[in-house]
């Protein structure tokens, strides 16, 4: 009995002391004018609130209660979620470059060669130099148009496959990924590389572990968690396989004389600049490998993800599909080839793509990191704090969008919004200094294939599924990919019938 009483007293005292500590912790935070957030648990912070949910969904719920600038404690990591266009504009434009860093994760550090790339590199001379080379040599509007014959060639290959599969179930997730990968390989590297399908799968797996939610990311001071992190071993196995593939690409380019265009491709340019004594930051071989992996990560995953979400939403909304196909078939009738200039006429289809990116942004949570202490919406954001811009949440906010949960492309006829980085409630490609440099290239790789898929085929869901039966869930990870593959049945369209 005495032991039970003593135990009860100890528990009561411990609870009282813990409550005092928590109150003192909250008081000290409020005195610092930090952003508001839900009550935290010791050690884990707010991790329990993310359990069983996708982070962008859980953080959207928090913003409804605590406001558009929300403090989220992820283990040891002080994080801030921005969920309004005003706060996002302040962080991505007015405070740029104070918020222009990327936060590091175990996934990006291992798979992207210590972040020696463009996507995950900190804001630095190296990042500026590599981005400039990328834009001028690969991703300019002129170059995007010059790649038209590659898009046409690879699209013809896909159309032939779909024609031969008429009436059969086709895994469109697999086919669109292959199409996008082939276009990117030929445009960037001069040819379709060996093991490209395996590399695409490695990219997908890498991005799923690059969001910064591994235990070793959330408790960086714990040597034990870092040592016991099972995914770390998996990442290193993946990295060794990636390195083997990328090393082969590098060696092949050292030996070859010219690419598909009969001249330099982007890797040849990087090798040439590697030898240039005038460049500001030396370009290492690892930086070239990281750039190649970037090209697959940003190009293949985001373009194919958007195309698949467009097709999924069209299948779920037959009236929208019918309207989009009517426009495409009227505008493209009689044309033997289709490319960037042709799709500019397709206003409704372009609105369909916009509406898809509103509801299914390629990167639901854009990752940033503070380079210095700053202030957003009057709240103090500490140096090195992790910042996550909830693009998914802003795309479904009724303050900015009428009927936000309805797929309604016509909204863009009524409200002039684009995704070029100036409308901060709609930034699927990011904004500010770190806006996606491949915006034009990626958009062309979505719109041109989409127009031809809508023109040449009528589509049905597999196995008699109804539109209302479709699973529109997203998978976990940095990119907002579909949780399940998209299975469709194509029927060739006869313009003369």
From Swiss-Prot:
Chief localization class? Answer: endoplasmic reticulum
| Gene3D superfamilies hit by this protein | Cytochrome P450 (1.10.630.10)
Record's subcellular location? Endoplasmic reticulum membrane
Residues reported in the UniProt entry to bind heme: 436
Topology versus the membrane, per the UniProt entry?
Single-pass type II membrane protein
Q: Pfam families of this UniProt entry?
A: p450
Q: Which GO terms describe its molecular function?
A: (S)-limonene 3-monooxygenase activity; heme binding; iron ion binding
Look up the record and report any one GO term of the cellular component aspect.
endoplasmic reticulum membrane
Q: Which reaction does this chain catalyze?
A: (4S)-limonene + reduced [NADPH--hemoprotein reductase] + O2 = (1S,6R)-isopiperitenol + oxidized [NADPH--hemoprotein reductase] + H2O + H(+)
Q: What is its EC number?
A: 1.14.14.99
The entry's keywords? Endoplasmic reticulum, Heme, Iron, Membrane, Metal-binding, Monooxygenase, Oxidoreductase, Signal-anchor, Transmembrane, Transmembrane helix
Which InterPro entries does the entry link to? Answer: CYP450_71D (IPR052306), Cyt_P450 (IPR001128), Cyt_P450_CS (IPR017972), Cyt_P450_E_grp-I (IPR002401), Cyt_P450_sf (IPR036396)
- Transmembrane portions of the chain: 2-22
Needed cofactors, names only, are: heme
Other remarks on record?
This gene is normally not expressed in wild type plants. Gamma irradiation induced probably a mutation in a regulatory gene, leading to the repression of the native limonene-6-hydroxylase and in the novel expression of this previously silent limonene-3-hydroxylase.
Q: What does this protein do?
A: Hydroxylates (-)-(4S)-limonene to (-)-trans-isopiperitenol, a precursor of (-)-menthol. No activity with (+)- or (-)-piperitone, (-)-isopiperitone and piperitenone.
State the family named in the UniProt similarity comment for this chain.
Answer: Belongs to the cytochrome P450 family.
PANTHER family associated with the record: CYTOCHROME P450 71D8, OS08G0105600 PROTEIN
Q: State what protein this is by name.
A: Cytochrome P450 71D95
The record's gene field reads CYP71D95
